[in-house]
């Protein structure tokens, strides 16, 4: 620990820095001893600790503290609350500058201050200066770290971990699946995932018998999420954190889970007669803010949180659309005020023309796209229209051949990865059935089979200058591609082009590859000498390289014979 400070008066008695050495852009954690305070520590109007600190640039930040309780982890990796451990207060922040900080933690009971402790600390210079992820600031069609480095999401959903007992809506309280999948993803350069915090099982805070205003009974799950954050950091995975999902608040609709919902009046601590009332009931609105406050207090420090997602497929809930929109506005404003760290905010819908997902309160547009044939074309079409209409990044955060049944087919996965990457979206389209894909080997004994496709996509993505103001999205019409089966998606700058050329008839329903020959397409580039490299999207290697000189700002390209798909990088060398 780096310091301990005691107080002589008030109910805050001591603060201990738990971080050995505080460093910019790394977690700084503190434990606060409070005596004699009374109230519900999950309701800030009843009892709260606020951490206010001034950074070296003179700016002041306020971040909530949270209740923590020690857990035991058995030989099977199951997390349970330690019955001998008392709850304690903790604070977590990520300093973004090196230098001296002044901090103050204040205790409030029934919104009246009843204790305070002041202290100073210093943050050493950062080893990793990339910072948090946000929207690229000039063109608004990609993502970047605070230092300007582009971040291209490559990955899949891993919304929960262990095998679920769907009848009971329970699952083992372990991290085995997340750890295994994230380690495999990291091996093959995948860097993005998505996690649900709201389901009745796994990491969810709202089980059938849970209280809606007090998370004491699920602090073992909160501790498991602490360790999942560490696993994400170790494997360089940046995850979307989803607060609620659609099934919680529909009665008989898609994936309904209303009977298991803690808010349901038929359950021990519930009080809602109708699930749609969640969006307007004053108590629900207050408790939603308590929940968001706790999550941001405990995990908001993490640079590995890609974004906060308020709802998964909120269109499937029983709420009125106007009420849903008003709720999202209120919660987004609350999140931005409460989270002292610059995380993005979004929401999602199963319908890609649902008006809410385009609302300008969100940092990017979050789409879901399932189905084949035509999935590649629809990903490209919807992304193109959305970007030109709304001038924000678009992500396909769920994709798959079939939305309702676990179905693994390598054609669908490969094409969705590349379509997302090359169709005017700054990320791969993200597959849904992660558990089935983890086990998929295509008849081989290769346990990494389904993960190998990530690395070539990641390598090719590194070449694309996402922040180039002269870059434009191109498809077959603009490139005058001449072949009836071949199609193309990609990016054309003044002196480069990065293209994905694919057999549009090679789909799940037509999985036999056909040799594609005699393709031509036209590019307009600055005059000069260029390097043309052809890329194997399955092995991740450039298999053919040639030089050419462009005169008259025009070149006709003839791809080599291929099956399935290939990619092209053409770059000016002088």
Where are these regions (language model features)?
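Non-catalytic, glycine-rich low-complexity segments
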Residues: 2-57, 63-69, 120-125, 487-490
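Short, hydrophobic beta-strand segments
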Residues: 32-34, 89-96, 559-560
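Aromatic- and carboxylate-lined catalytic core of secreted/periplasmic carbohydrate-active enzymes
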Residues: 39, 402-404, 413-546, 560-574
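Active-site mouth of glycoside hydrolases
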Residues: 48, 108-112, 126-376
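A generic structural motif
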Residues: 52-54, 108, 144, 533-537, ...
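Solvent-exposed beta-strand/loop surfaces of large extracellular or lumenal domains
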Residues: 57-82, 536-555
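Extended acidic/polar, glycine-enriched regions
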Residues: 66-138
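Extracellular glycoside hydrolase catalytic/binding regions
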Residues: 290, 297, 311-453, 514-516
């Amino acid at each position: 620990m780096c310091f301990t400070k005691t107080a002589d008066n008030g109910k805050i008695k001591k603060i201990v820095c738990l971080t050995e050495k505080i460093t910019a852009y790394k977690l700084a954690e503190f434990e606060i001893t409070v005596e004699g305070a009374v109230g519900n520590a999950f309701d800030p109007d009843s009892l709260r600790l606020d951490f206010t600190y001034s950074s070296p640039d003179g700016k002041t930040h306020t971040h909530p503290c949270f209740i923590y309780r020690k857990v035991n982890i058995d030989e099977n990796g199951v997390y349970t609350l330690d019955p001998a451990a008392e709850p304690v207060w903790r604070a977590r922040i990520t300093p973004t500058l090196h230098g001296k900080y002044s901090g103050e933690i204040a205790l409030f009971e029934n919104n009246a201050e009843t204790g305070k402790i002041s202290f100073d600390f210093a943050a050493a210079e950062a080893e990793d200066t990339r910072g948090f992820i946000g929207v690229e600031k000039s063109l608004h069609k990609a993502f970047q770290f605070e230092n300007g480095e582009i971040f291209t999401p490559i990955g899949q959903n891993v919304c929960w971990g262990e095998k679920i007992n769907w009848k009971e809506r329970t699952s083992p309280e372990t991290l085995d699946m997340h750890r295994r999948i994230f380690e495999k993803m990291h091996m093959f350069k995948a860097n993005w995932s998505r996690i649900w915090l709201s389901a009745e099982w796994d990491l969810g805070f709202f089980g059938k018998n849970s209280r809606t205003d007090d998370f004491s009974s699920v602090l073992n799950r909160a501790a498991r999420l602490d360790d999942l954050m560490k696993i994400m950091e170790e494997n360089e995975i940046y995850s979307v954190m989803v607060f609620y999902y659609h099934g919680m608040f529909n009665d008989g609709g898609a994936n309904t889970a209303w009977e298991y919902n803690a808010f349901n009046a038929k359950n021990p601590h519930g009080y809602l007669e109708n699930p749609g009332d969640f969006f307007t009931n004053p108590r629900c609105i207050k408790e939603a803010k308590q929940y968001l406050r706790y999550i941001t207090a405990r995990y908001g420090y993490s640079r590995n949180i890609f974004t906060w997602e308020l709802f998964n497929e909120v269109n499937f809930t029983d709420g009125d659309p106007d009420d849903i929109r008003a709720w999202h506005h209120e919660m987004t404003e609350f999140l931005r005020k409460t989270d002292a760290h610059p995380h993005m905010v979004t929401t999602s819908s199963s319908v890609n023309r649902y008006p809410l997902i385009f609302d300008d309160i969100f940092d990017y547009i979050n789409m879901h796209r399932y189905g084949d044939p035509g999935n590649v074309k629809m990903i490209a079409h919807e992304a193109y229209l959305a970007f030109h209409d709304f001038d924000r990044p678009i992500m396909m955060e769920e994709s798959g051949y079939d939305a309702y049944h676990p179905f693994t087919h390598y054609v669908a996965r490969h094409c969705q990865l590349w379509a997302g990457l090359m169709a005017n979206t700054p990320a791969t389209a993200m597959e849904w059935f992660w558990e089935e894909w983890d086990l998929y080997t295509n008849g081989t004994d290769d346990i990494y089979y389904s993960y190998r496709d990530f690395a070539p996509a990641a390598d090719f993505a590194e070449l694309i200058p996402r922040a180039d103001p002269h870059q434009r999205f191109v498809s077959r019409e603009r490139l005058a591609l001449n072949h009836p089966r071949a199609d193309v998606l990609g990016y054309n700058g003044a002196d480069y082009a990065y293209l994905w050329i694919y057999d549009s008839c090679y789909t799940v329903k037509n999985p036999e590859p056909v040799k594609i020959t005699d393709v031509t397409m036209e590019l307009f580039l600055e005059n000069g000498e260029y390097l043309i490299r052809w890329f194997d999207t399955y092995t991740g290697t450039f298999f053919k390289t040639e030089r050419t000189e462009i005169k008259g700002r025009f070149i006709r390209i003839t791809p080599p014979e291929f099956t399935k798909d290939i990619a092209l990088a053409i770059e000016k060398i002088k």
